[in-house]
């Protein structure tokens, strides 16, 4: 009789910015068995060690939050060197785009194990987008939403008050563990971009907020925290004779809005050329789904996307142009006053896009309740994601 408890191998469950998730877990090179109820994240050694260190620190810090284990998947992690991947392990390995960027492929992964480590973690359930697609009934979606709101209020907001920012919240980084209607947990994962930052303390500018491309799950204004913007905008201010001694800078910049729009448009083009498109295409897809019923000409969608991004950045610049005592440009006022308070909320809200997209694709067959949710989500996206945030 065969032993049905033997775990034969792991398959790729998902891929992220730093590694690929396998379920069941991969085997460590010093063990003969695979861990049960565990998944593995195969990563370059330096990223695995970095994330493991982050998790240890986070667990020690966030454990003071009541029921923190219900909101964050940050405990019971371990790292090890991987054993040789089996044929089953290599199933769908081509989906592991993260390692492919580092020239590690299905063909050479077993000869590249010295470069890799496994981050083992408890199984936390399905990603929010997968859960939405598999569970379309109204009751389960309402339950999911209730747990999401608990995550926001009792987890994310409390964490932010402790000056800790996940910085990469999105549907694929939120897991829902649905055992039954009375036992459901929704938790944050993937803490590789976490930032610990205390505002107004003149700390080093966090590296995870510097020189970033456009991203769909953080405010567009993240692309203002670049060396290119600092230098080009400083030159713009000099050209328009705006200095630390200028009075009513905001009023003056409003009078020069047309110049600012041109400047921001040119900056975005230069930054995309320098850093790449980032998530621009996906942002355009979101805008398409939000506004296609309002705009007859599909070609106008891309124009609208550009207009939304430009307007967002222009308003930030108008309202948050400040100078340091030495007369140099000061981007910290916006970072400390606004950005840190909205970065994780932004990601949390956009995590609902898979639900909106599902309703969008089935728009003509939506019932009254679904249509109401669809309209509410659209309103929330526009209000909290795409209108410029110049106050919390």
Can you say where each PLM-predicted feature lies in the sequence?
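A conserved short helix/loop substructure at the end of the activation segment
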Residues: 384-392
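ATP-binding glycine-rich loop module of kinase domains
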Residues: 17-101, 106-107
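Conserved N-terminal boundary motif of the eukaryotic protein kinase catalytic domain
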Residues: 2-12
């Amino acid at each position: 009789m065969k032993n049905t408890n033997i775990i034969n191998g792991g398959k790729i469950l998902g891929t992220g910015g730093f590694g690929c998730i396998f379920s069941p877990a991969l085997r460590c090179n010093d063990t003969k068995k695979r861990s049960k109820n565990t998944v593995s994240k195969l990563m370059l050694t330096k990223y695995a060690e970095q994330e493991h260190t982050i998790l240890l620190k986070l667990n020690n810090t966030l454990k003071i939050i009541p029921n923190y284990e219900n909101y964050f998947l940050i405990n019971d992690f371990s790292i090890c060197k991987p054993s040789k991947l089996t044929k089953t392990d290599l199933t769908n390995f081509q989906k592991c785009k993260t390692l492919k960027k580092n020239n590690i492929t299905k063909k050479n992964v077993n000869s590249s194990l010295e470069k890799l480590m496994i981050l083992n973690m408890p199984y936390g359930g399905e990603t929010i987008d997968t859960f939405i697609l598999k569970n379309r009934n109204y009751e389960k979606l309402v339950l999911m939403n209730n747990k999401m709101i608990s995550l926001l209020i009792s987890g994310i907001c409390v964490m932010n008050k402790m000056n800790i920012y996940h910085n990469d919240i999105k549907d694929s980084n939120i897991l829902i563990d649905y055992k039954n209607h009375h036992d459901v947990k929704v938790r944050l994962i993937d803490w590789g971009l976490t930032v610990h930052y205390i505002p107004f303390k003149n700390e080093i500018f966090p590296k995870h907020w510097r020189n970033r491309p456009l991203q769909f799950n953080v405010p567009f204004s993240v692309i203002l925290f670049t060396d290119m913007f600092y230098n080009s905008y400083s030159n713009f201010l000099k050209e328009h004779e705006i200095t630390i001694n200028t009075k009513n800078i905001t009023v003056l910049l409003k009078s020069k809005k047309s110049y600012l729009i041109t400047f921001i448009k040119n900056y975005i083009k230069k930054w995309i050329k320098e850093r790449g498109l980032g998530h621009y295409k996906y942002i355009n897809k979101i805008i398409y789904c939000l506004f296609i019923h309002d705009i007859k000409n599909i070609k106008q969608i891309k124009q609208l996307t550009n207009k939304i991004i430009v307007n967002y950045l222009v308003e930030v610049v108008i309202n948050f142009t400040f100078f340091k005592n030495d007369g140099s440009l000061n981007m910290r006022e916006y970072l400390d006053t606004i950005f840190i308070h909205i970065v994780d909320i932004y990601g949390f809200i956009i995590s609902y896009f898979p639900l909106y997209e599902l309703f969008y694709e089935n728009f003509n067959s939506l019932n009254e309740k679904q249509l109401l949710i669809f309209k509410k989500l659209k309103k929330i996206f526009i209000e909290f994601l795409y209108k410029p945030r110049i106050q919390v």
